[in-house]
Amino acid sequence: MKKTMFTVASVAILGLMLLTGCGKMADSNKVEAFPTKAEKDTVKVSDCNQFEDFFTPAFQLVWNDFTDKIVGKKVEFIGGNPKIADEFNKQRLTDKMLSEKDYYKTVAPQTVKTKKTIEKELKKKFKEKSQLLDRISWLKKDDGVHKILYCMFKKNVYFPKVFDKLPPAPFITQNTSKTYYEMFGVIKNQSKFSHQVVPVYYNGNDDYAVKLLTKSDDEIILLTTTSEEPVLEIWDKLYSDKLSKNEHLTFDKNSKLLVPFINFKKEINYNELTGKPLANSNTVIDTALEVIEFSLDNTGAKIKNEAMMGVRTTALRPHEPQRYYYFNKPFVLFIRSKNGSVPYFALKVKDPKYLQKG
């Protein structure tokens, strides 16, 4: 007799990673949230970290442009890279892996004109307003020094059939509280959703995964795990061991599905990337911000992700000592014909006796 499959989304490679098909890892101690007003019914998350607990596309695309269009090579900081910089440098996700209809990005002078252009394009493409553009000052004219790198990614995916709303239930952990959370899924009429729910594997009550198919080509994949590994490593293992083989089970009358509603917002200030000299460029990052909003319910998933980087070019590469070729001390002077092997004049200046007084 088949075991009942009672699927609970107890952990996550959630839609933040799954809508784009990749994952990332992060420096858990350095990412800090900056103040904002959380929207109604949205949980403002402060204890999850980029690259450890979630993956998002916008800042990666900004970083890619910073690497390719500003620095011209892999980003390296003097004194070594923060862990998060090394992860961004891997460029696991590029714009070629995404549909152009899902994102807008630009690299431009940090001017009022650029700000207005971005606002116009966001309204035209996504009917959205930026939450980041007002966080920095904008120049009236291009000074040739300050540039802005910006990206917004927005995507909504919908289930072919709306899942049933189920009675609220607790979220099971080692310290399960008495709080109940909104749930959706399938408890009966399994045949109605058999083409929408694709079990990837089922190895017992605490080890299973499912794919939730959408109207588009996107898949929302949920698996149970208590692993402390970064989300990227969890994804790589899942893809290598299961998804790449395209094997699956059947969602039948003995199967049940239970998934929590998710609604959160995260704002990040990448302080560990700002104000630090680069070893291979005369550019300094002044601002590095990101906003992530994600929701999952019985109709589908929505992700809105915005990132912005402000950079400036310094007169000299900050890592190079200034070179003072000052001959106001003992020196020798030679004059020769071009490429001559012997100078036709030479003078040793040991003291100021040959110098002209000012």
Residues of each region from the PLM?
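Hydrophobic-core positions in well-structured secondary-structure elements of globular domains
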Residues: G23-G358
